[in-house]
């Protein structure tokens, strides 16, 4: 009954604290069936104690009871209280409270059981899929190669453990490396879209979005911009013009001045250097947290694309001999920027790098282990599933993933479907040996620690009494921040224990204060300084931060630490070095005891000023300590261990001096010059990618093959080898069809290259051949018809009504039309023919869910025979989307998967050979109830390292598998890049629902018209199911979206007039 005695004590404490009923419900996210109706209020209150809006003793005691005692003890307590049957209000409340806590404990146990079952099932699925992938790849693996794989894995582990290239150990080495790369003119794009980002006076710690990542990306951009070989660096972020933030965050561009131009000086051009470029997207007058940015990501991508295109032209004139200078790499930071970088990388066909900073799956696992919230509750608060899907997309699209530590690779990225360390090593070994990977790809994981600027740091020598030794023996004026800190202390000369972190629960500052307060010897020997961001009024801080700060103040009062703890309200970013100097002058210690620290940049900063460290052993500090060897690692949950480590360092002068010396000796392994060298060395290993129609050789000679005319004239000759013959393909097998298509393509391409080689402008081609595709450049507006949720007859009628509504503009040529569909081009042709619509009524056709882009052709010479279709395919578009396309290896896996699904005797999926193309593998769904939702199919492909975009179409009756970065929305961006069709001048017409890529058609800077009415098909649950809600990714209240009932010409005309596409009737 000892357990029950503790429970009784806690229950009495809860009653004394008051508000028990509400606190109990909040402590575990509610209880009983009625709790489900509380909606968002319950979700917000169900945050764990250290992340809630206000400190509550009742919540604390409830959580202690639920987490610390067995369900049986709780049941016995309830039985005892129920048996008392006392009419007193207190006993009645005690009985009710005991029952509710008992049920909450049962709920917690149930959640834990469900999560354990889910994880076990997930492990089995991964093992099965990866065994299949390993067996598939081992078919042609020789015994010698199998043996070599072991050595490869070992060497890879050693390389990743080191986490960096050999460091630049001297100024001579730096200068030698600089001279080797000075002739390069690289353009690098970095992306970090949340938080408040500016080059000077950064408001670090103002909120949870403005922390270490902000400082890292700014300093990385600054350092890269000063590195030889780099001409320009753009750090793209969000433009914020909100009244509650400084005006500087609304400036479109901010130049980052180099910290040290001596070592990294190079010839500066007109647009060279590093810049913060702020792209307007989302609410113009609001500063919103990162969880609310997801619906606006595509708008950012479109704005960033415009900037990059403009800058590429400018740099082409300055350093590219007139040719566009594309970014050598696009580097996303955190999941939201990674999602943006993936789309930009796909649109521009340039390599992508990703740095996670913190990862969604790791956070989800930690929250689920606590058992206080369900998966749905966590997702509602943090939009965690949308974040995880973005991180999975980053694995699909990135060539390199940069991490700070080895732990992040093994323990955090290992949680993702798209990454497996063992398979990554095998694939890399096969690539080195030239062995087929069967369409499988894995990004390269590289541990590269963040850098730091040391040029302005001059650690002072400290004598045995703790006084600074000046060369002239005279003192110097103390910085003002010293007085702001020392006014808190009754004895300011005692060694200072310094913690610098925002008041966030995961920073674990409350445990530090407890450790300090309960260790009498430490209190007598040292002072504690807590630099916890900036604040004016505690009640005006965010709820989470104010709760933590209130807890700290109460602990200071509890342990009577007045005169021993400093917690200044304000400090400037420029004063942080002075704070480090003060701690070093007093022979103090720097501490970071966060529960998990992804890297720990402040530990490096402190070491640079001669401060030993005490740091958490969870995460990046482990790697930092391995290099610097300047302190002690501790368990952040063990306050006694924290206190003993601090006491040991401040009390042992020899140990303190040795740790200080080690840190200063090794600190330059974390310098920005070395970081940039390692970074650019990795970038240099990437295969250059850029749009293929750009001429890559000497610009003084204009080659016909590089002109837009020849690019599409060769397309005429190949003329859509998607089996344009309508009557010969059905009888052939897939293998023979593909072989014949390839042979025909080679022959016709050869004829096109060798015959009639003459320079011809786009305009001349239009005049001589009658082709309409160049007209895209001259359209003022483009109407994109992308309606998936209607029958063919309704779609034909909608097209005709749109033509009628815009008849005047059609005749004048100011408005053009694009049909965007999941159909193959042969199906499009049949649809148009059935409705009496000419192909030339459209400027372009986006087919096969965005894997093919075609243009109409009215010239009979363009067609290979009368049976072939009047379309031309854009081969340049294929070069844009072919990145990581698995081809025949992917097709083989899909066929096996479809066969496995049909093992029960009933056919579930059948390959649709007619509608498949080189970059689209199409299936017909025979049994919609037996096929998994898209998220499960994507998961299956990712586990096997197959990178593709899987989507259901035609109300779930068809399945298309296309390249991972191909989509109908990406095809619209290609039209902008290739032909200059402004995205803001496009209007996309959609239904109320659509294919599983529907969300991509709604976001962005283009206008959107949604057709509502009973003619829309009811979404099929198979393809409508997603891991996150549509509202998490689409903002339906943005100005560019409107809805109309039906699809009559008058309603359509009114909507088009609303967006300024049509002129009002005079």
UniProtKB/Swiss-Prot annotation:
Stretches the record annotates as Disordered: 132-166, 688-714
UniProt keyword terms in alphabetical order: Glycosyltransferase, Transferase
InterPro entries in alphabetical order: Glyco_trans_1, SPP-like_dom, SPS, SPS_C, SPS_pln, Sucrose_synth_GT-B1
Protein induction: Circadian-regulated, with the highest expression 1 hour after the beginning of dark period (in 14 hours light/10 hours dark cycle).
Pfam family, one: S6PP
Regulation: Activity is regulated by phosphorylation and moderated by concentration of metabolites and light.
Recorded metabolic or biological pathway in which this protein acts: Glycan biosynthesis; sucrose biosynthesis; sucrose from D-fructose 6-phosphate and UDP-alpha-D-glucose: step 1/2
CDD domains: HAD_SPS (cd16419)
EC number(s) stated in the UniProt entry for this protein: 2.4.1.14
This protein's record includes keyword Glycosyltransferase: yes
Tissue specificity annotation: Expressed in germinating seeds.
Keyword Glycosyltransferase attached: yes
Record's catalysed reaction(s): beta-D-fructose 6-phosphate + UDP-alpha-D-glucose = sucrose 6(F)-phosphate + UDP + H(+)
Domain of life where this protein originates: Eukaryota
GO biological process, one term: sucrose biosynthetic process
GO molecular function, one term: sucrose-phosphate synthase activity
Bias (Basic and acidic residues): 143-162
Enzyme class: transferase
Protein family: Belongs to the glycosyltransferase 1 family.
PANTHER family: SUCROSE-PHOSPHATE SYNTHASE 1, SUCROSE-PHOSPHATE SYNTHASE 3-RELATED
Function statement: Plays a role in photosynthetic sucrose synthesis by catalyzing the rate-limiting step of sucrose biosynthesis from UDP-glucose and fructose- 6-phosphate. Involved in the regulation of carbon partitioning in the leaves of plants. May regulate the synthesis of sucrose and therefore play a major role as a limiting factor in the export of photoassimilates out of the leaf. Plays a role for sucrose availability that is essential for plant growth and fiber elongation.
Self-association and partners: Homodimer or homotetramer.
The protein, known as: Probable sucrose-phosphate synthase 4
Record organism: Oryza sativa subsp. japonica (Rice)
